[in-house]
């Protein structure tokens, strides 16, 4: 008991991260600015130009802090351009730079914790751990032995203040948190940045990095309690529930039946040996070898944890209990399923031979065509029926740029969905993008598609050869004659760290 408490105190002592002085360092905003120009996967190019000044950002921060302590409301208006002026400059642009700089600052303590976690340990390189594709070999290895899955849509916080309160537990820097809270409350636009779309959690494109950090940290906080209980499950019988309540005492000190009533039953749930949890953004999977009764207990536990300790309202329809043998999982752009594959084995015993029919479980991954068509429709590459359309906004570009953009999109999609067991859906996407490219070029040159393709020849097709096709022929040269068997192979990559968003590709 005492040893366990000391471990908690040690963890707590490492969380006094004072980041307030970094907010006034110019190199922080230069780093955020460079990330924007380099079109980082987390931070889009927000339209900076040579007129932006780090000195103005620093002065604006000082001015805002003065206004904060004098309780003078300095409101950023989204409509009145005259109100958005500071020293003759647009405060809207510089407020975005402040948020992006703040995102860089608050990430530093957690990045240092990651480095200390990986230091001195024989682990896979961190960039390999970040790959989305690394989860599918894990599925293939584990899912065939499991029975039930909880398909979870994680609820969203009802107010931005909850996100700040969660961050307060790790960053014991009151000045930084006051400044953050001041930004969130005084800028009306930020209050409407978090929206709910079809029971999922989404952010507006502006300052996405900062709010994604707050939300992911909020989710990781509840996950840390989940993992904490899981890892200590074999020692819990000698530990009182108050120990666990200390970790979240900054929310509310209450005695909830989640930890106090029928505590032995809760411990039994955590001691389930075949239990796996995965999450990406606002969707999570909890897979177990147990029964439906056990999964219902997990559902009850998660709902109570979200609602009573993290003030995240959860509805029953956000958590579904499914049997793996009868259900396909829609996760990370793939339809994953476990199906029975018949297997015939011939057995020979002296003079007699007979056939034994067995059924083995096989993990399959397929690319769903309907969501991909919807993404192409949203990006205006085709209509709702899947018929290719021209891209008028790209007609002003050069021919090589147009072809490169279409080819780049398809190469990204083909690269990401290389793990699909069947490639017919990719062929259809390739057809749509190729014909959309031809329509765009024909529109630019004021010609028909037939005449343009006749003049261009097969040159257009060469841009749509993917790296995956080259990898297939280099990896499996002997199978080049049997294309059907060749394209049923799956390849998982360790350099994919995000899902491509066609709608935002401009």
Curated annotation (Swiss-Prot):
InterPro entries: Domain_X, Maturase_MatK, Maturase_MatK_N. Usually encoded in the trnK tRNA gene intron. Probably assists in splicing its own and other chloroplast group II introns. Keywords: Chloroplast, mRNA processing, Plastid, RNA-binding, tRNA processing. Belongs to the intron maturase 2 family. MatK subfamily. HAMAP family: MatK (MF_01390). GO terms for biological process: mRNA processing; RNA splicing; tRNA processing. Transmembrane segments: none annotated. The keyword RNA-binding applies. PANTHER family: MATURASE K (PTHR34811:SF1). GO terms for cellular component: chloroplast. It comes from Empetrum nigrum (Black crowberry). It is found in: Plastid, Chloroplast. Pfam families: Intron_maturas2, MatK_N. The keyword Chloroplast applies. This is Maturase K. GO terms for molecular function: RNA binding.
